[in-house]
């Protein structure tokens, strides 16, 4: 919230797909609840849909469903629910998840694992992805389908963006090439952050530098709902359909 207040142009933060962290924060800073709620309501913070980010295979089906229901209910109290199922680092995703998420009103799902074939001793075989793109259609056994977004370059592929032009040029030459290699549209997803990493307060300046270096590219500090809406509007390729469990 301090960055929202003090850093001009710093406007978005995805709270890792869950709401439980809000309880911890408000136990200490209860006096800031109204301010926090206002940032969530305006879309600066994206929260939910989970109550706590889980590993689906380590919990029961009932626990997975209730985790989602409680997370949505909790997020609604603050005025906004991010309608993107989120599994950045789950070690496999259950086959019924598109069915569960769709019934809960989710519009897409983002995940980091499970779209490469797995061979003996859980070794990933070569570079043969089950989908040609980082965007795909994930289908449950009952036929339910959701747009899936694979973090093909992982969930920290846009972290620590340089502000200085020489370093930024080297950084963006590599990042744009890597993300564009898998993307089905011109909209490239770069995730600015990683585990245990502070926010990048000078992100607006870093994106300003990027815009100067690449005048034909629009760099936006955005969020999942905006990105997914843009992807859906721009899709002109038939996406691969991946059915059932995603395990790798």
For each of these PLM feature ranges, what is it?
Residues 1-248:
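Catalytic-domain carbohydrate-binding cleft regions of carbohydrate-active enzymes
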């Amino acid at each position: 919230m301090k960055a929202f207040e003090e850093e001009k142009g710093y406007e978005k933060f995805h709270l890792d797909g869950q709401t439980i962290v809000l309880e911890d924060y408000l136990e200490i800073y209860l006096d800031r609840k109204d301010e926090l709620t206002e940032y969530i309501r305006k879309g600066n913070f994206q929260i939910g849909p989970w109550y706590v980010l889980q590993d689906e295979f380590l919990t029961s089906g009932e626990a997975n469903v209730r985790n989602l229901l409680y997370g949505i209910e909790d997020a609604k109290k603050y005025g906004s629910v991010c309608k993107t199922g989120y599994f950045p680092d789950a070690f496999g995703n259950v086959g019924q998840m598109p069915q569960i998420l769709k019934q809960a009103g989710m519009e897409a799902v983002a995940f980091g694992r499970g779209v490469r074939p797995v061979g003996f001793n859980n070794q990933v075989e070569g570079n043969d992805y089950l989908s040609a793109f980082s965007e795909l259609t994930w289908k449950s056994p009952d036929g339910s389908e959701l747009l899936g977004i694979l973090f093909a370059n992982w969930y920290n592929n846009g972290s620590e963006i340089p502000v200085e032009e020489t370093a930024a040029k080297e950084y963006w030459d590599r990042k744009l090439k890597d993300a564009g290699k898998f993307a089905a549209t011109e909209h490239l997803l770069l995730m600015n952050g990683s585990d245990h990493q502070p926010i990048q307060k000078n992100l607006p300046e870093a994106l300003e530098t990027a815009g100067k270096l690449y005048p034909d590219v629009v760099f936006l500090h955005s969020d999942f709902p905006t990105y997914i809406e843009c992807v859906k509007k721009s899709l002109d390729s038939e996406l691969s359909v991946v059915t059932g469990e995603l395990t790798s």
